[in-house]
Amino acid sequence: MFSSRKRRVAKRAFNAKSKKFPIGEVVSTRKRLKQNTNTPPHYDTSEDEDEDNYYNY
């Protein structure tokens, strides 16, 4: 009985680890973080360019 409980706990811990850190998810979150950090400056620069064009006209 005790060994089966041990096995169950170990299995649960392994499942939790694999759910938290699968390779694909880590890559996708890194990509998402890169997109999140990169997109606001792009939007800001495009808005600034639009404003500059507006003021130039």
Curated annotation (Swiss-Prot):
Residues 46-57 have a biased composition (Acidic residues). It comes from the Viruses. Residues 26-57 are annotated as: Disordered. This is Uncharacterized 6.8 kDa protein in LEF8-FP intergenic region.
